Amino acid sequence: MIGLIVEVRPLQAHFRVPYNSLLLDSYPFPPRTTAIGMLAGAIGLPEEGFRNLLDELRYGVIIEDPGARTEETATIFKSQRAPVYPITKVLYHKPYYRLFFAGKEETIERAHDALLDPVFIPYLGDSESLLYPAGGDYVRIVDVEEGEEATLKSVVPGEEYHRGARFLPIRRNHLTPREYRMPIDFVYKGKGRRAVYKRVVAFAGGFVELANPASVLLFDGEPVFMF
């Protein structure tokens, strides 16, 4: 089995948490739907192709560096009589993510080639957050094996974490574990769609030791929980 590792360090990143309004909060990592959407755009797939990728690919992420959390506040004027509200948007400055994908060999190879020569410009989250490579060898295909591991750097499911876990920080700039509702899929009805969420725990700058080993994929020996 083969997998794809994509290492990115954008100048800024914003992954909107969709269940709030006046505060445009951000996940500290690319959610599954965002990361797979990035591949779909690079390949040049229409909406139907994106839906197929969501069904086919598995995804995991390690936050190597959360970056600096910043905020910008703006007011949108619709008309003189409309109520005016300030809106605050959360951004992460120069984060560093390692994205992991697993799926059919031909799909992994196609995604690899597309990121090197994309149909549409890849971006992370909103259209202002362009994808910047973390280095020269930022996208590569590696061997993948199934395994079990209790010590992880990747985002983990909430249910696994709450069975018992401890966080071991190894860097001063770290994120303590926090639970999020991550969009992992969409349910389509007519021309509309709604997100399907899964509770996950994200952290950075250290390891999480789970009480029980979890089923993972090993990307060149690196254990990653996949969604």
Language-model segment annotations:
Residues 3, 56-58, 96:
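Extracellular structured ligand-interaction cores
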Residues 7, 60-62, 100:
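Residues in well-ordered beta-strands of folded domains
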Residues 11-14, 26-28, 90-91:
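Residue-level preference for alpha-helix termini and adjacent loops
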Residues 1-20:
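N-terminal, Lys/Arg- and Ser/Thr-rich interaction peptides
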Residues 16-81:
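Glycine/small-residue-rich interface belts in oligomeric ring/scaffold proteins
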Residues 64-227:
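Internal, well-folded beta-alpha domain core
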